[in-house]
């Protein structure tokens, strides 16, 4: 009779399960993608049967059949193997399962939405060919999306790790698509109105087709955003990833869109007032897109600012810092362009119209970015004590100072190169000011930014150091005293920050230091208080600068004080 051999289970912390999950989930991901590509190809041929796009495409048909008939069964078998393993809680809590579902959910959502919306826009535009392939791609990937959403929401086998990431990814993608489509639709509508005002003819498709095509993308994106943000509860998520997405997309992206749109509108208005060298229709060309970007961006920004108000203080600070950074970048750009233009005008009083246009662009950037930075950063208001100790503010100050300093150093090198090139070049290629005005403008802007933020960083450090409690130089202090020890205990604790233990002298009655009872029966209270104050001041001076784990302090006889540093226990 042979004994059965027992195969030992993998030891705790073994890399075998991790490697196995990496291989299995990577292979499953690839097989699902291959199968979806094959199915979409076959469905596209079915929808586009009889068209020129699919007629005679033998290679495409062979590829689709191979991907579907070979990759499909392999993907199904591997998925069934993985699905049975997910009865184990360890498998459900693994990073591989969570990352696979998140990655496939994101890929299928993006591909399905892009395919369906592209087909819808093509149909609105009156295209007879091409939309079939987009629709087939969108429908197949929509099925993949529904399948993985079912697994993600499964009551027993849903991932335990990063379960909320698909919600955040879906909401972010929907917001981006919705904002892009809305801006494009509104821009086309405004451009049509502006062209009608300027009586300029437009070529191409009718304006309403462009508006409806962009509106289809906008409505589709808003629907995706609503489904994940409202229906799936994305707005209630308070995880770190959700907060990062809120700040980066909802705040930073919206602020960039708003600042760019408002700045462009102001630039167009300034050109209409002071720089009409070009035709009015050409000057007004970017106005529609700028108004649309500013309007939609401000709405998105205002909404997400309201949402961020209910988040943690760290999220609020991050939203403030990214907004301040955008305003700072716009203001610095305006300063640099302004210096560049001013130097050009000073060197060549009869400068061309291009310099005037450049100057108006700098004024627009400064007029938008400056107030935004001032209202957000509030340089005239001292920061809250709780804000000084936060890592985000320190990182922001160091990052702005470091980046500005790096750009300033590079700009100095460029200026030096231009100066030596001017001195050594025999052929005149313009004045020295013309050669150096662009890097000089950049140097002034980055120098101001670096200098200011370095000064703020130094000031914050001094405030933090002043508010930081003194480091305890003594852990424990033993006070040997006669009489009332309370004044001495208070002084010792204030000077050293240590815990104080009082030992009463046994020879209090015979020492020169009168005990409290003797003082009350014989000496006057005024003399006793003066003696106590003098002894307290003497003790404070004696303990100043003493550093030891334990300190023994012996007072008496009389005004004698002896401080003895001791070693650790």
Positions of PLM-derived features:
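Hydrophobic/aromatic interaction determinants used to assemble and anchor large protein complexes
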Residues: 1-406, 416-419, 424-425, 430-483, ...
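Aromatic- and Gly/Pro-rich donor/ligand-binding loops
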Residues: 412
